Amino acid sequence: MKIVDIIPISRGINKNTLSYFTIHDISAGAIVKVPVRGRTINALVVSSRPAEESRLELKNSAFSFKKTSSIVSQDLLSAPYMAAAKRSADFHAASLGSLLFSIVPKIVLENAKGLATAKAPERKPESLHGAILQTDDDERFSNYRSLVREEFAKGKSVFLCLPTTSDIRRAEKLLEKGIAEYSYIFHGLTKKKDFISSWNALAREPHPVFIIGIGQFLCVPRHDIGTIIVERESSRTYKSQTRPYTDLRHFAEMYAKETGAKIIFGDTLLRTETVWRYREDELREIVPPSLRVQTSAESQVIDMRKTRESEAKFDPISPALAEIIKNSRERSERLVLFASRRGLSPVTLCADCGTIVACKRCRAPIVLHSKANERFFLCHRCGEKRDANEKCVSCTGWRL
């Protein structure tokens, strides 16, 4: 008989470890079913020892030890995965059990007995090779395709971690060219039958694979992962909204440390803390990061002076904008109007020579305001205020 120390994989149970006895030879990392508070739950075995070594503990115990119900899986979670989970639990000031409950998908725990496992190799020396990739989407995914082919040539697999299912579907379309044969998709909407089939096929595939999934599926049975890519790194979805508030980006980094894999953080705009780490030389760059956001949106400048000349009544909205609003309402589309106007007029210019009236202190365009029958110019940059009764500084014209 043996005594096993287990961690319940369930919320609401704060004890770090519970002890049970068993007649089976169960090793650390196994998933077993145990009775807790009148219900049977999954639990993770963290240690196992012969009962003879715990005679005094058993004799002096104020309660009787319960027996484990059954073994779900002997090697479902690998030693590197467990070590990463322990480090992440310490970082989040949470128990290992509650953290595992948040990072291991429910579908994995419920179907653990029918899932194939793979023995993890001996732990590699810890060496984190981190990098950032801050560019537009097209360039990032082009780099990902090249990286996957490079890793395949080295006999290594790649895990592309994404925050949501919609992101996974989009990435699948962008990356399917040339590597679809060895690609495996895992997300929360996968049906049970398809999930078990994909999981077991992944475990048996001798060729390196490309895995696209949410962060919870880092527990897949592949121990040849050479690169972990955290795409859309700035997404808030990576962090859980309930206790223990797990940040999957941190767990992915800890897992990369335990397995010796490279980790890449990619996004159009990375988080401030990630950019800081890059500037402190903690992370390297794959390509020089783009510091400007490129947009494909079409810009159009409309001259309202022609509209005002042709219409007797003043209208702040141009006919072109009115048509866009009308079409959006007819198609039930969303439309955002952003108006940056402050004062009576954000810009005042000379009708004769076109010179813009500027602040005399900082040379920024000055804004016309009105208060109690008084008109004045106010600079919104430096705060200078002056009377609006003036002439053009360029041509001395009075038509401002």
Where are these regions (language model features)?
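Cys/His-rich short segments
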Residues: 316-321, 327-400
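Accessory, non-ATPase domains that flank or precede helicase/AAA+ motor cores in DNA-metabolism machines
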Residues: 1-312, 326-330, 335
